[in-house]
From Swiss-Prot:
InterPro entries listed in its UniProt record: Asn_synthase (IPR001962), Asn_Synthetase (IPR050795), CarA_N (IPR015230), Ntn_hydrolases_N (IPR029055), Rossmann-like_a/b/a_fold (IPR014729)
Known outcome of mutating E380Q: Reduces catalytic efficiency
Keyword ATP-binding: yes
Metabolic or biological pathway: Antibiotic biosynthesis; carbapenem biosynthesis
Domain Asparagine synthetase positions: 228-443
pH dependence: Optimum pH is 8.5.
Encoding gene, per UniProt annotation: carA
Source taxon at top rank: Bacteria
Primary enzyme class: ligase
Record keywords: Antibiotic biosynthesis, ATP-binding, Ligase, Nucleotide-binding
Full protein name: Carbapenam-3-carboxylate synthase
GO biological process, one term: asparagine biosynthetic process
């Protein structure tokens, strides 16, 4: 299962055939090009007045969108996802699609050859436009290389890419590519000589930074509503879900909430020979009655998780790849056992988990907002990797409603009295489902409790906090995959050693 796709402007059967040498999938003719969709990819299409609408991927908040469209059209209750977005687009305009959540790309193939493209806003399905021998639109750059060969993509110098900088959410290290701005409408068109270009505008204005000082009880009620909403949408489809469970607040809270919605929970904990959090995860599993599995990862498995995250999610940032390693190892462990997985990922950026208890911050909300924004280009929320393991990955914290609620929330709810994530701990405590020592346990990073960060450093011969070295290695692997010089099916230790030593 994969939602990878590409559109080639003025393409031909030959382009599709070239891709099919490396990737299973099918091609479909468009008004002025071809669409390629990987095998078993989730896609739907429908006819509308402007042309043919395509939805690649899935909607997460379908129930909400049906209720919205149903105000005007009863047919919304019978519509598939593509028809639902087309209906909202027709009735309310492109801006209405800012309300849609999911790992999707929606586009309209118009008879004049233009493509009107709507990108989702949370980094679940990053989309690029590439100017190679031909013009491409894709959420998987590997497909362009498969079609045009090793020289299809041109890369920025390593020194420029591996800097600890804040970047625009359109950033990509591929010089002849443009990452389409998330949460925007784009028109891919061409000039009088046939050269393609992109016109873009955002679907919404930036959120207000005015301090939100909600009273405690209404705030707790909103957190409860917004965290449960995605679980309520999933419950009719899945009896069993999987959860990566560290025993920290976020994964434990998601497990507790899921225990109210699903018949069976499979929980997974990972560690290394250096350290693990099995004591805490087992405590939560016992309290909630989950089917719990624990696994010690070797350094080879840690590196394999990093390599897979680079390949599938096209990550070039060392920290993001390191964090994803644990998740990819859980995907492998859970493959065939569950088809849906829930995580606590993203909570730290909303509720202050990355802040240091007792530290003084002039504007903690600004610091958190910068890190939320950063996820729009890192690839860490991309769903390709989980999909390749047959898993529908969901992050209940990463919703429009909860992100907006927390954006300007009073900092005292996030860091106060030598503690962080205060309001989330209060909420978890109010459920009376988790042991108090879990609710008030000190924060440890997802990659730190299992010492994945140290294992990565050991393989590179570096120090645990040297993320420039980690990013250099990650970017080298990223380039090797996107040039077609490495294959995910037969990456060898000697190839990786060459990339580590290359300086």
């Amino acid at each position: 299962m994969s939602n990878s796709f590409c559109v080639v402007y003025k393409g031909s059967d030959t382009d599709i055939n070239n891709i099919q040498r490396d990737f299973d999938g099918k091609g479909e003719a468009l008004s002025n090009g071809y669409l390629f969709i990987e095998q078993n990819g989730h896609y739907q299409k429908c006819e509308m007045e402007r042309g043919t609408a395509y939805l690649i991927g899935s909607l997460y908040n379908r129930t909400f969108l049906i209720g919205l469209a149903g105000v005007w059209e009863g047919e919304a209750y019978l519509a598939n996802d593509a028809e639902l977005l087309a209906l909202l687009f027709t009735r309310l305009g492109a801006n209405a699609l800012a309300l849609a959540e999911g790992d999707f790309c929606f586009f309209i193939d118009e008879p004049n050859g233009e493509l009107t493209v709507i990108t989702e806003s949370r980094g679940f399905s990053p989309v690029h436009v590439v100017q190679g021998k031909k013009a491409w639109m894709t959420n998987s750059l590997k497909l362009v290389t498969a079609a045009e060969g090793e020289g299809a993509l041109w890369f920025e110098e390593e020194a420029l890419v591996c800097q600890s900088l804040m970047r625009a959410d359109t950033y990509t290290p591929v010089k002849n590519a443009q990452r389409l701005k998330p949460g925007a409408v784009h028109v891919l068109t061409h000039d009088s000589e046939g050269y393609s270009f992109v016109e873009s505008r955002t679907l919404t204005t930036p959120a207000s930074n005015q301090l939100l000082a909600l009273p405690r009880e209404p705030l707790l009620a909103l957190i409860d509503r917004y965290l449960n909403a995605p679980l309520e949408d999933l419950a009719p489809r899945f009896d069993t879900v999987g959860i990566p469970l560290s025993g920290g607040l976020d994964s434990s809270l998601v497990t507790a909430l899921a225990s109210r919605h699903f018949k069976k929970l499979n929980t997974y904990s990972i560690g290394t020979e250096l350290s693990n959090e099995f004591e805490f995860s087992q405590q939560v599993a016992d309290a909630l009655g989950t089917h719990h599995q624990m696994k010690i990862l070797s350094e080879t498995e840690v590196i394999n998780g990093i390599i897979e995250s680079i390949y599938y999610n096209e990550i070039f940032d060392g920290l993001s790849a390191e964090i994803q390693s644990g998740l990819f190892n859980v995907y492998r462990q859970a493959q065939g056992q569950v088809s849906c997985m829930l995580t606590g990922y993203g909570s730290d950026l909303l509720f202050g988990g990355i802040l240091k208890p007792g530290a003084q911050y002039d504007n903690p909300n600004q610091l958190l907002a910068e890190q939320v924004y950063r996820t729009r280009w890192t690839g860490e929320f991309a769903t390709h990797g989980a999909s390749c393991y047959g898993i529908d990955i969901r992050h209940p914290f990463w919703s429009h409603s909860l992100i907006s609620l927390c954006h300007a929330l009073h900092p005292d709810y996030k860091i106060f009295d030598n503690e962080v994530k205060n309001i989330l701990r209060e909420y978890a405590d109010s459920l009376q489902l988790l042991p108090k020592d879990i609710v008030w346990r000190k924060k440890i990073g997802i990659h730190e409790g299992s010492s994945v960060n140290q294992a990565f450093a050991n393989v590179l011969g570096s120090t645990v906090d040297n993320y420039q070295t980690k990013s250099r290695f990650t970017y080298r692997v990223y380039q090797a995959f996107l040039r077609g010089r490495l294959s995910i099916t037969d990456v060898t230790p000697s190839q990786l050693k060459d990339l580590i030593k290359k300086d």
